[in-house]
Amino acid sequence: MFSYFHPEEEFQVWKVENYCHRCPHAVLDISFNDGERYRGMFEAAYDSENGGDLDIEMDDPRYDEFHQIVFEISEIIHDGPRRYRTYLSIDYRDFPTLITDINTGETVYSAQTDPSRT
């Protein structure tokens, strides 16, 4: 059984990470709600926190821990406000709406079937 920092991670980051471990050479098409879109391959996954981003300590009520997935970007389909160039990090705070395997056409993640988004 997995331990999640946030309940939605089960249906988002962990679902995608598990797929990437099963299909390590998959090239994924990663789309965000605002039209921003990338293609890339799984690079890494790790637990992270926002203390450095906000320059805060663990006892600050804004402090948050979460699991992140990192993709090496092979193609920028549609650029947007995130401005990623080489690596794309995703976590529950700004998760894509659709992730598909471009080789198999399989939907790896869809916000439409994510129970944490309904």
Model-derived segments and spans:
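Conserved RNA-binding domains used in RNP assembly and mRNA/RNA metabolism
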Residues: F2-T118
